[in-house]
Amino acid sequence: MDMYQNILVVIDPTTNEQKAFKRAIDLASRIQTAVPDMSVNITAFFSIFDFSYEMTTILSSGERDNMRQMVIDEKQQWLDDVISVNSLQVNNTSANMSQISITSEVVWHNRPYEAIINKIINDKYGLVIKGTHQHDKFKSVVFTPTDWHLLRKCPCPVLLVKEHDWPEQGNILAALNVGSDEAEHLSLNDKITKQAKNIAWLTNANVHLVNSYPGTPVNIAIEIPEFDASEYNSAMQAHHKEAMNKHAENFDIALSNTHVEEGLPEAVIEAVASKIDAELVILGTIGRTGISAALIGNTAEHVIDQLNCDVLALKPEGYISPMAAT
């Protein structure tokens, strides 16, 4: 089974409380418990940039380099202290740390997402974990440009961490597009479900599957009087339920844990996740049609904004980041 042995954690430089780092330690310790001989590497990482250092023309390039390095060194010391404190907090919860290696790095870069993705590509990370920001007065999440770029361009899975715990016997929700017979979607459905089962095995959780299907097109019902909207809707529902049942049986998932609902993907996913109190939603973020395509753009922002749990975003097999060639 797939395991995350090389994890990159995007550090939030605005706080000492690092929920993404703690999630990485928790996940790594669960991997250690499940597979004792497997080592897991965690890198705490973030980029910094101050344009004023680039505009100091009275200094030589060497002096500017030295000033930048002083800032990097200062942030590196802060990062190492934060890692030490957060690691100690996790150690106090009986995490298995025997074969978990923790390193850290601060780089100078004016585009955080580029620094992150370059690091992932160069050092072949299998997972990136990043915390989300919340409004001070509201529970909704601020969807940052870095989040958006990572979802679009990161070659490895992206885990966006919120505040929801991963309890024993919790629920993991896999968002699928079972209504499509395109090879890309079938492969992505399989990949999402396999990841859900892997993480459920590590966390002793239950896997649920969700799929949305479109309702009757209003314009057709108006323009074609003889069109039977009820029959159309029943046929659409039956098609998606049959496909969902087949997929669930292929992965030995109880049919009682499948959810096929009419509506927009963002509405259906949020409703089911809330209903089962999901600790994690796993979804695909690249695709031409259906649920995967709908999760690109504003819909992705809406889904992640509304969900009160972690989100793991996967790419299809064979995906190549547009930054890989740059």
Where do the protein language model's features map onto the residues?
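General small-molecule cofactor/ligand-binding pocket signal
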Residues: 43-45, 101-107, 159, 208-210, ...
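Glycine-rich, Arg-bearing micro-motifs that act as flexible, cationic patches
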Residues: 130-149, 280-306
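Glycine-rich phosphate/pyrophosphate-binding loop and the adjoining helix
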Residues: 206-253
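Structural beta-alpha unit
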Residues: 1-3, 16, 26, 36, ...
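Short, structured interface segments
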Residues: 145-166
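A short acidic, glycine-rich active-site loop
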Residues: 63-77, 228-239
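Short beta-strand elements of ligand-binding domains
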Residues: 129-132, 157-163, 311-315
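Small/aliphatic-rich secondary-structure junction motif
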Residues: 1-65, 171-226, 306, 316
